[in-house]
C-alpha cells in the first residue's frame, strides 16, 4: 500500500527535486547551442520522478526547469516558462502512460513498454520546446534563434537521439534499484492511476 504523505514531506520533496533539477540542468551546459541545451540531463529525473514523487515531483521539476532556463540557458524570465511547460509535458506523459507493472514486473515486455513511453514523451517534449522557442524568436520575444543556423529537423533529431539514449540506459536501472527503498521509506507515489486510487481513499 502507498501511504499518504504529510504536507511537510511534500514541501521537502518539492524543494529537493527543484534543487536536483537545477543542478543537472547546470551540468548540461557544456552541450549547448546559444540559449539551448542539446544534452539535457534532467531527462533522467523526468523518467523516474513521476513514479517516485508524483505531484510534489512535478512541482519541483517545473521550478527547477524555470531556474535552469533563466540561469543556465540565459533565457529571459518572461520566456523561461517554456522550460517549465516542457517539464510538465514529459513528466505528465510518463506519469500517466508508464504502467505499474513496468516497475514491479521485470520482464522484457514491461521493459519495452517503458522504453516506448520514454520515446513518446521525450519526442513530444523535445518537439514542443524547439517549436515554442523558434516561434518566440520569430515574433521578437526571444532575442536569439536557438537553432543557430541549423534546420529544425537536425536539431530535433540530435537533441532527441542524444537524450533518449541517456534515458533508456539510466532510468530503467534507477527504477529497478531505487524504487524498493523509496517504498520502504514511504515516499513512493506510483503512477497516476495509483495516485488517484490513493486520493480516493482519503
Question: What are the residue ranges of the model-derived segments?
Answer:
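Hydrophobic transmembrane alpha-helices
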Residues: 1-59
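Lipid-exposed faces of alpha-helical membrane segments in multi-pass integral membrane proteins
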Residues: 12, 16, 20-23, 63, ...
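Residues within alpha-helical transmembrane segments of multi-pass membrane proteins, especially transporters
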Residues: 20, 44, 48, 52, ...
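Central hydrophobic cores of alpha-helical transmembrane segments
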Residues: 57-69, 114-118
